[in-house]
Amino acid sequence: MFAVFRCTFFSWLLLGVGVCGNVVYPRLLEARGLDAEKVLYIQDDVVLRLQKTSVLSESFVFSENINGRRVDKIMNGKEIEADMYYDRNRMASVNLKAKNGGVEVKGILGHRLRIAPLDISARTGDGPIPHEIFQVEQRAVIPGNHSVGQEAKSDDNIFYAELKIVADGNHRDAFKSDQELVEYLALSMKLVNIRYEDTSNPRVQFLLTTVEVAENNFTELFYAPDVDCPGRAVKIYMDPVLMINKTAKIYGNSDEDITVFVTSVDLADNFDGTAYNHVMGQAKLGGLCSKGRRVAIVEDVPPTYSLIQIIAHELAHTLGVSHDGDEPLQSIAQKLNSRCTGFSGHLMAPSAHGKNNGHFSNCSIEQMRAFVSTLNESCREVKLKTYHKARAQELPGKILNRTYYCQKKHPNYPRITSEHEDYYKPLCKVLCCADSIYPCFEEPAVDGMPCGHGHEKICFRHRCDKHVDPLKRSQ
């Protein structure tokens, strides 16, 4: 039984930073203790109060296939996460490194804004390092290590699900190094875990234990006319039905509680050579910890973090959660009291971009609670003892330029830009429009994107308000 998420949600929150392409010189103002709050000044309207976060296991496994052989590399999750910080109020998440008398910052400033250091040639010597703030956009509708001690031990109050992420070669190629890929995924899962803070009795959280790069011949691809950009003859798509079945065959009995395959290829159903690309993810309903079914697949457009809302949605399906308004999983139906409409726009709505799609409905929370209660002790036990932590210190949307976001989400559309921002910002949406002969695409804002006048409000979990940056709070 498949649970299909048919629309993408871009889950970065944007911080109110002035102009795309703005050059800034971040500096550390204050540090209160080794792992306590750090104050990072970027510019007058962007001051981050950063704390450490935990997502990665202590002995993190990175796997790839070399000449047909699988090679496992043990990475120090503690070292990867050593530079990861977050600001919960600002919905920002960044990597922070001291370098030659200055500070180097990479990551998310909010829903749409990103920050990255300029090329080293732009620097004259020691001291402040020049950085660029840029914006990203979304697609249309239709890190250190932390030991698992008392904090990461499943009990009556918290259920930790161990997660493996398998990335295809196309997704891996978007990053300069294996560590950069791991840090990107760790930060994404930190923001997924924040969404799962809605859950209770138990609270559900995910531990990222392994990242693997799939073999080149692993994917199920097909060619079809480009349904989004008629000016192009053909495009490569990935068949989600064939892909999830292959993922289940290879990873359905992995040691981890759940495996998620991530691709940067457009997922699309194949109807006699015609692509229908409204599918953004797929999962085996109730598959978590099951035999042969503990898998899901999602689509992502790095470095926009567009997978966050999708993977949060698909992981809920593996935890036995149906779409709002649909019949619940039969095995837990007798444990449920709530019934919810499919039109409330929550995270598990049949379609995305609803007004509440950064949050679970009461029905989803109840279904998750009922499903977890059916799991055996082996599943509820944390087996690997270590996990990966996110180093980022602020929400990705804070430094993500809206037009850049549009360009990454719709790379084949000429002169695509973010338009009608005064209207769409308070809705925590981005309208991406190219030349007039093409349609516009409505995309969800990324966590941290600014959404009000004066940059006091940011989008977080698809709501515009004066949010406290969740990355500021230790996990």
Model-derived features: positions:
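Fold-level signature of zinc-dependent metallopeptidase catalytic domains
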Residues: 2-12, 16-56, 129-289, 302-309, ...
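Disulfide-rich extracellular modules in secreted proteins and receptors
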Residues: 21, 26-27, 80, 92-98, ...
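Long, contiguous regulatory modules within eukaryotic nuclear regulatory proteins
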Residues: 31-96, 415-416
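Autoinhibitory propeptides
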Residues: 70-145
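Short, hydrophobic/proline-enriched secondary-structure or compact coil segments at domain edges
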Residues: 103-111, 255-264, 429
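Conserved phosphoacceptor histidine of two-component systems
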Residues: 313
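Catalytic-domain carbohydrate-binding cleft regions of carbohydrate-active enzymes
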Residues: 316
